């Protein structure tokens, strides 16, 4: 496969941007080799600047659930562009998307739009403290909630890929109020509440982990967190930036029947444009300025283009049979991956929910981030390169979930599984 133009562009990029990228995982540091530079995307496919085509299982890290550049989304954006790219003022599109989110997500009675998942999580943390009058929070090892200082403690894929426990430049005083527990460990959470009476503002987690690889909640875990937070007067926050509208139309909370107090969202709700949101019970959300005293603002928040793409994407997802189709596609993919690895005698464990999937190159089960670290990252790097040579674009990290879309066809899945069979045989 010729990648000479990608190599030249990335070489130039390293003189212009730190590491040559705008987000660390894109640099391929954990899988080796140089990154592929994309030229365009359409449906389930991405083309690089050298003309190579790939079946894409990243989907812009989650937003492209309907497929890249869906014609109805593009048409809606073209119409919206004629009216301007940014208003900096209220627009009716915000109302429309807000109503759709409130209708879909069980916990959300009011919503505030922002520009990224990080911004949503930063804002919801401030809101947790404002509402409860408490400073501490509990997060889980391997759960990623953006790159805000207080969340960069045992934060999963980003820092794991770099081999860093957290990040230089984060003051110890900032993280001293961040308490961590292993995912799927209710007893550890009980101990933290016992050790910090009336001090914990809330518990935040990815209800389905996608940034420590793909890890699912054990039966009773989410329910147990709901009971504990109520018992201690703390808030339960689901970070559904990744799982929202991806594992079901109402996200993980609808799928598992556990309703948090607050929810953060992003990715899918922007239809591929920069967006984030946080929402929850009205009595909590009314703390947010200008309705209440907790300040949060943004120049591009509620951007009309992002709202337009989000509205059209959710309209497409709401069509009958959408999630059954996504689930079927993803199950066929992950089952085929597991079979291919086992045929090559490569240790593997994996799973899928909705349009998310993941696997670890180790014996299972994987219940938490500590278990995930047993994955054979070196072998995964070899597998990633082998798949890339066969035209399959996987996340360039052993600690990231994968994503399917409505655009992935049966032929795409079969082509992908053929590549996995060959690649597992090559790295066995």
Swiss-Prot record:
Entry annotated with the keyword Cytoplasm: yes
This enzyme catalyses: (S)-4-amino-5-oxopentanoate = 5-aminolevulinate
Q: What is its EC number?
A: 5.4.3.8
Top EC class of this enzyme:
isomerase
Residues bearing the modification N6-(pyridoxal phosphate)lysine: 267
Q: Which domain of life is it from?
A: Bacteria
Q: Does the keyword Oxidoreductase apply?
A: no
Biological processes annotated in GO: chlorophyll biosynthetic process; protoporphyrinogen IX biosynthetic process
Keywords in UniProt for this one?
Chlorophyll biosynthesis, Cytoplasm, Isomerase, Porphyrin biosynthesis, Pyridoxal phosphate
The pathway this protein participates in, as annotated, is: Porphyrin-containing compound metabolism; protoporphyrin-IX biosynthesis; 5-aminolevulinate from L-glutamyl-tRNA(Glu): step 2/2; Porphyrin-containing compound metabolism; chlorophyll biosynthesis
GO cellular-component terms in the record? Answer: cytoplasm
Q: Which Pfam families match?
A: Aminotran_3 (PF00202)
Q: Which cofactor does it need?
A: pyridoxal 5'-phosphate
Tell me where in or outside the cell this protein is found.
Cytoplasm
**UniProt-recorded Gene Ontology molecular function terms:** glutamate-1-semialdehyde 2,1-aminomutase activity; pyridoxal phosphate binding; transaminase activity
**InterPro entries, from UniProt?**
4pyrrol_synth_GluAld_NH2Trfase, Aminotrans_3, Aminotrans_3_PPA_site, PyrdxlP-dep_Trfase, PyrdxlP-dep_Trfase_major, PyrdxlP-dep_Trfase_small
Q: How does this chain assemble?
A: Homodimer.
Question: Which family does the record claim for this protein?
Answer: Belongs to the class-III pyridoxal-phosphate-dependent aminotransferase family. HemL subfamily.
Q: What is this protein called?
A: Glutamate-1-semialdehyde 2,1-aminomutase
> What organism is this sequence from?
Prochlorococcus marinus (strain MIT 9303)
Q: From which lineage does this chain's organism come?
A: Bacteria, Bacillati, Cyanobacteriota, Cyanophyceae, Synechococcales
């Amino acid at each position: 496969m010729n990648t000479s133009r990608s190599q030249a562009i990335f070489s130039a990029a390293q003189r212009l941007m730190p590491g040559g990228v705008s987000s660390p995982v894109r640099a391929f540091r954990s899988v080796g080799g140089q990154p592929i530079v994309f030229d365009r995307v359409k449906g389930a496919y991405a083309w690089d600047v050298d003309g190579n085509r790939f079946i894409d299982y990243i989907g812009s890290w989650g937003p492209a659930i309907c497929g890249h550049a869906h014609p109805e989304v593009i048409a809606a954006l073209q119409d919206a562009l004629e009216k301007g790219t940014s208003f900096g003022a209220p627009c009716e599109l915000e109302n429309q998307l807000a109503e759709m989110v409130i209708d879909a997500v069980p916990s959300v009675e009011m919503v505030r739009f922002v520009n990224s998942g990080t911004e949503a999580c930063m804002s919801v943390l401030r809101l947790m403290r404002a509402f409860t009058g408490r400073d501490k929070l509990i997060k889980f090892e391997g759960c990623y909630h953006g790159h805000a200082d207080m969340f960069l403690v045992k934060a999963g894929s980003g820092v794991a890929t770099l081999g860093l426990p957290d990040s230089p430049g984060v003051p110890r005083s900032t993280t001293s109020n961040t308490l961590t527990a292993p995912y799927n460990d209710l007893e550890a959470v009980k101990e933290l509440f016992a050790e910090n009476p009336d001090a914990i503002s809330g518990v935040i987690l990815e209800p389905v982990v996608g940034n420590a690889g793909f890890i699912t909640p054990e039966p009773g875990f989410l329910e147990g967190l709901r009971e504990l937070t109520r018992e201690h007067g703390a808030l339960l926050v689901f970070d559904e930036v990744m799982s929202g509208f991806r594992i079901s139309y109402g996200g993980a909370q609808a799928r598992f029947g556990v309703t948090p107090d607050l929810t953060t969202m992003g990715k899918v709700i922007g239809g591929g444009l920069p967006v984030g949101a946080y929402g929850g019970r009205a009595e909590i959300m009314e703390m947010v300025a200008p309705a209440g005293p907790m300040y949060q603002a943004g120049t591009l928040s509620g951007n009309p283009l992002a709202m337009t793409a989000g509205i059209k994407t959710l309209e497409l997802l709401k069509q009958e049979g959408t999630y059954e189709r996504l689930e079927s596609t993803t199950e066929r993919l992950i089952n085929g991956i597991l079979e291919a690895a086992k045929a090559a005698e490569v240790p593997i464990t994996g799973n899928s929910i909705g349009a998310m999937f993941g696997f670890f190159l180790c014996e299972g089960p994987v219940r938490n981030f500590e278990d995930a670290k047993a994955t054979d990252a070196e072998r995964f790097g070899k597998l990633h390169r082998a798949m890339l040579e066969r035209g399959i674009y996987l996340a360039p990290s052993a600690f990231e979930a994968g994503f399917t879309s409505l655009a992935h066809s049966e032929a795409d899945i079969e082509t992908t599984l053929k590549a996995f069979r060959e690649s597992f045989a090559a790295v066995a």
